[in-house]
């Protein structure tokens, strides 16, 4: 019969199945669940004995609690990592600070800081990927400029950069004993952000010292927030580079904001990417600047910002 039906009509005949009441699966509004009925028929479950109510209720409860249990597991895992991260940090921080305060040579201080920063990243399972490291490993004077995304940017850069630098930090950090000693021993330069006259004097001072042993490193955004995105870059770093006629090396930081955001002390797992660009030489901008220092600073800023925006993985907030 099935063969004749297929020959005459081109389709197999329907299979009529007699099932007990309530065997046809329906929605809460009474509509037939055709896909579910088809699956039950193909698996031989259509018309079988109904499962006990307590079994059905157990399946419903399990289906409802499974996502909650998954969220709970993730929350516990994240909290465990955060506690572990702070324990590791506070175990490494005191000997690191003491080494910075007591070692007599800046090169020794930087070597110790680099070892401790890399050890911290390794113990926390945070991978730091660096591209273009050779661009920063130059013997000539230069100014490095990066975006600022998190409290941990400085630690990451100490671990990632191929040579020591002198971070340019806000003068407010001088008020704290711990920060003042630590940053001063690193060779940091402090600038005033809110006093215009002092800020101008700091800019002139930085322009005069760009040819010293280690290059200056600026976080040109000036600050960071929880909101992802690249903010406008302040001109101080670029004016210093233009006045002293040294190249600017752009550095893009990606991933640190998601690990430790502004206003949060709950570190999370993640990976970090550092993209170091080719030095931007004033000679390559001569057609745009025409020998004018201010135009040179603007051109350096625009080129640097373009590199950072391409590699930081965040939107443009300018």
Where are these regions (language model features)?
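Non-catalytic C-terminal accessory region of glycerolipid acyltransferases
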Residues: 42, 200-318
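AMP-binding/adenylate-forming catalytic domain of the ANL superfamily
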Residues: 7-31, 48-56
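Short amphipathic alpha-helices in soluble, non-transmembrane regions
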Residues: 1-3
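N-terminal membrane-anchoring alpha-helices
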Residues: 67-125, 129
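Generic structural signal for residues in well-ordered beta-strands
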Residues: 13-18, 128-130, 274
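Catalytic core of membrane glycerolipid acyltransferases/transacylases, capturing the structured
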Residues: 92-110, 121-123, 137-196
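Acidic/polar alpha-helix N-cap and adjacent early helical turns
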Residues: 38-73
């Amino acid at each position: 019969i099935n063969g004749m039906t297929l020959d005459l009509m081109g389709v197999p005949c329907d299979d009529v199945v007699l099932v007990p009441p309530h065997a046809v699966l329906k929605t809460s509004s009474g509509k037939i669940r055709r896909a579910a009925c088809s699956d039950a028929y193909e698996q031989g479950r259509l018309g079988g004995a109904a499962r006990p109510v307590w079994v059905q209720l157990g399946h419903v409860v399990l289906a409802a609690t499974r996502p909650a249990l998954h969220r709970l597991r993730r929350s516990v895992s994240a909290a465990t990592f955060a506690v572990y991260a702070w324990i590791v940090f506070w175990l490494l921080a005191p000997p690191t600070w003491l080494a910075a305060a007591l070692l007599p040579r800046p090169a020794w201080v930087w070597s110790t800081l680099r070892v401790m920063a890399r050890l911290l990243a390794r113990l926390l399972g945070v991978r730091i990927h660096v591209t273009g490291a050779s661009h920063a490993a130059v013997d000539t004077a230069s100014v490095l400029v990066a975006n600022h995304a998190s409290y941990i940017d400085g630690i990451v850069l100490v671990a990632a950069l191929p040579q020591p630098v002198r971070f340019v930090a806000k003068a407010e950090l001088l008020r704290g004993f711990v920060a003042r000693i630590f940053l001063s021993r690193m060779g940091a330069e402090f600038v005033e952000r809110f006093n215009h006259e002092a800020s101008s004097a700091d800019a002139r001072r930085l322009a005069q010292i760009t040819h010293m042993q280690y290059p200056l490193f600026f976080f040109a955004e000036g600050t960071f927030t929880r909101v992802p995105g690249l903010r406008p870059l302040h001109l101080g770093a670029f004016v210093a580079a233009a006045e002293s006629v040294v190249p600017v090396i752009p550095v893009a930081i990606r991933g640190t904001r998601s690990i430790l955001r502004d206003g949060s002390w709950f570190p999370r797992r993640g990976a970090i990417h550092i993209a170091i660009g080719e030095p931007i030489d004033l000679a390559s901008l001569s057609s745009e600047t025409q020998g004018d220092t201010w135009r040179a600073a603007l051109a350096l800023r625009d080129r640097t910002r373009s590199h950072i925006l391409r590699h930081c993985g965040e939107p443009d907030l300018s």
